[in-house]
Amino acid sequence: MAQAKKSVDIKNIRNFSIIAHIDHGKSTLADRFIQMCGGLQDREMQAQVLDSMELERERGITIKAASVTLYYTHPNGQEYQLNFIDTPGHVDFSYEVSRSLAACEGALLVVDAAQGVEAQSVANCYTAIEQGLEVLPILNKIDLPQAEPERVIHEIEEIIGIEATNAPTCSAKTGLGVEGVLETLVDVIPAPTGDREAPLQALIIDSWFDNYLGVVSLVRIKDGRIRKGDKMLVKSTGQTHIVTSVGVFNPKHTETGVLEAGEVGFVIAGIKDIFGAPVGDTITLSTTPEVASLPGFKKVKPQVYAGLFPIDASDFEPFREALQKLQINDSALFFEPESSDALGFGFRCGFLGMLHMEIVQERLEREYDLDLISSAPTVVYEAVTKKGDTIYIDSPSKMPDGSVVEDLREPIAECHILVPQEYLGNVMILCIERRGVQKDMKFLGNQVSITFEIPMAEVVMDFFDKLKSCSRGFASLDYNFIRFESSSLVKVDVLINGEKVDALAMICHRNDARHRGIALVDKMKDLIPRQMFDVAIQAAIGAQIIARSTVKAMRKNVLAKCYGGDVSRKKKLLAKQKEGKKRMKQVGSVEIPQEAFLAVLKVER
């Protein structure tokens, strides 16, 4: 639906994003803004309007950044165009945040007035300050009886180091004070700079694939303007496309026919090639190809790798297409084909963390209707061979033989943890159990900020969940990869009836290997259904077996028909049964259920 375009003077535009920790009320505040500026009628309002993915609404988290254009009339009578981007708060999606910030001049830092500052808000806030944005702190959830605005203002100033004495307070749930937030925002956040008469220069912030429209790109116009019918040039591919539709989200898809410097909106040019408009690229018009490219985004490196395999082999091609479509929308996803003896053909995929992996797998299963099995996730290890070559190992099957390896190194993550003083002991114990080395500790009011260096393999598995449970949910975490470090690593193979099952192998530290081997073997014993013969499950490092358990055979009572009778007769029947089981074992194969593959992921420490 096209509508007459309100041409807004560039000095009346405000581009900002909302950054906050998980559950501090970003999406709710966004809902209030939309309601107050009349973006949607009351009947269309629903909680978390911008979290359009079913999965986002279910889990109550924001995964994708979403943009909205609203018109707000300030008490001074001026009408302002607000373009705002709702960003994710979870540590796995921090790259989404840095992309959104590139399109803005300011950021609202939403802090829960009861919980105070958390690690993720600190990390995202620093990203914003580094990119030169104006950061406006806002205290949310002021209606809660346990809200302590003075303490939290003090925390913001002490931990993040930005002025917060005049920070607006509001309650996004009830709508109290939200009007004040909008006023302050217009006064504090600077207007974008840009020349509308200059040649077009626009940055692609995000793109996604629509089966009918092709690639839809979310862009921020730096200079010039783009109209429907223009011939646009994508700088990195050098290809030109005719623009078929231009507009904004308010939050509904609204065509405006033109976007001018300073604005954020969408551009559709019927690009059917999935990689036709990469995120972070620059768009200009085909008549001005000499326009410089804008600095893009740094490529994020996957931290966790896992194999994903379709349960039905005929789904392999649809699975490849689904991954490609997801990859436009989720630039951190990496994949390459892989085959496994146990699971057939599939892809080795790289993710940012365990939550990211779960989300991707669920999106593939829901949006593309696939049934998938995943193998155990591993981080990337570095091996130096005796010849001096460096190899990167992202799967246990690629682990080279011990005889050729000079040195094995594992990735180390620097973890910044913010935790209230009373839980400090528990958190320290957890970090040390995870082979962490303490680097720094600062006391900030009631909170303690500690820095540990912990092997990435320990962090990505379930560290976040454990951290939350040992601190009753108060500790928060932000981590980043710093270096590779030599370590005593081994590959633990799982053998079922003497045959290696490649999808169950794992790489771990030598000190943990025995313990994890025993735990895994015991868990597998419960999950593999009983067969007609004994099934031996073993864990081994090289040729040395470190753990074993047996799934006992089911057997018929062959003596049921001998009432009394001769003992030699009974022995003969039992011997005959034993012989049969032995023959069966030679030819029988064991079906391993999907749960058994998942057991590897959940082996307790």
From Swiss-Prot:
One BP annotation, GO: positive regulation of translation
Principal cellular location given in the protein's record: membrane
Gene3D superfamilies (alphabetical): 3.30.70.240, Elongation factor 4, C-terminal domain (3.30.70.2570), Elongation Factor G (Translational Gtpase), domain 3 (3.30.70.870), P-loop containing nucleotide triphosphate hydrolases (3.40.50.300), Translation factors (2.40.30.10)
Domain of life of the organism encoding this protein: Bacteria
Enzyme Commission numbers on file: 3.6.5.n1
Cellular compartments annotated: Cell inner membrane
Reactions the enzyme catalyzes: GTP + H2O = GDP + phosphate + H(+)
GO cellular component, one term: plasma membrane
Binding positions for GTP per the UniProt entry: D23, H24, G25, K26, S27, T28, N140, K141, I142, D143
Topological category with respect to the lipid bilayer: Peripheral membrane protein
PROSITE patterns xref list: G_TR_1, G_TR_2
Record domain tr-type G: where: 11-193
The entry's keywords: Cell inner membrane, Cell membrane, GTP-binding, Hydrolase, Membrane, Nucleotide-binding, Protein biosynthesis
InterPro entries: EF-4, EFG_III/V, EFG_V-like, EFTu-like_2, G_TR_CS, LepA_C_sf, LepA_CTD, LepA_IV
HAMAP family assigned to the protein according to its UniProt record, in alphabetical order: LepA
PANTHER family: TRANSLATION FACTOR GUF1 HOMOLOG, CHLOROPLASTIC, TRANSLATION FACTOR GUF1-RELATED
Family: Belongs to the TRAFAC class translation factor GTPase superfamily. Classic translation factor GTPase family. LepA subfamily.
Functional note: Required for accurate and efficient protein synthesis under certain stress conditions. May act as a fidelity factor of the translation reaction, by catalyzing a one-codon backward translocation of tRNAs on improperly translocated ribosomes. Back-translocation proceeds from a post-translocation (POST) complex to a pre-translocation (PRE) complex, thus giving elongation factor G a second chance to translocate the tRNAs correctly. Binds to ribosomes in a GTP-dependent manner.
UniProt protein name: Elongation factor 4
Organism in which the protein naturally occurs: Acinetobacter baumannii (strain SDF)
Lineage: Bacteria, Pseudomonadati, Pseudomonadota, Gammaproteobacteria, Moraxellales
Gene: lepA
